[in-house]
Amino acid sequence: MIIEEIVGNVANLSEEEKQKHIEKVYLENSDLVKRIQRVTTDHGNEIGIRLKNPVDLEYGDILYQDDHNMIVVDVNSEDILVIQPRTLKEMGDIAHQLGNRHLPTQFTENEMLVQYDYLVEDLLKSLGIPYTREDRKVNKAFRHIGHSHD
């Protein structure tokens, strides 16, 4: 089976639709940005992904769906630093430092998420900014954004 488009996301399904048999494809965060890849489901079925559009995969994306079954993307958990600045100044300080390092960062309502890096952990300690180190699933890929200093 070759998957060429994302059908939808389980977050947008009705409760009735969520009752279908779910087969999962477990991906590493770095695989979420790959448009072309061969994967194996948790049922041992091999499928090819060749997305027509340049979009990143996300947690819960439906790759295939029929009346009774669906194949859904799940994301393996990874080592994450969960940064919880207490003030706007702390947020600005750490955001500036992470930006200077060109580190991909994700944001929630109250947290900044980065992949674990001992240098960032040392920086957070030295700045006194609260953080935790967690094994956590993230919904989207940590993506590097290209830039230049022209």
UniProtKB/Swiss-Prot annotation:
InterPro entries: UreE, UreE_C_dom, UreE_N, UreE_N_sf. It is found in: Cytoplasm. One of its GO terms (molecular function) is unfolded protein binding. Keywords: Chaperone, Cytoplasm, Nickel. It comes from the Bacteria. GO terms for biological process: protein folding; protein-containing complex assembly; urea metabolic process. GO terms for cellular component: cytoplasm. It holds the Pfam family UreE_N. CDD domains: UreE. Involved in urease metallocenter assembly. Binds nickel. Probably functions as a nickel donor during metallocenter assembly. Belongs to the UreE family. This is Urease accessory protein UreE. It comes from Staphylococcus carnosus (strain TM300).
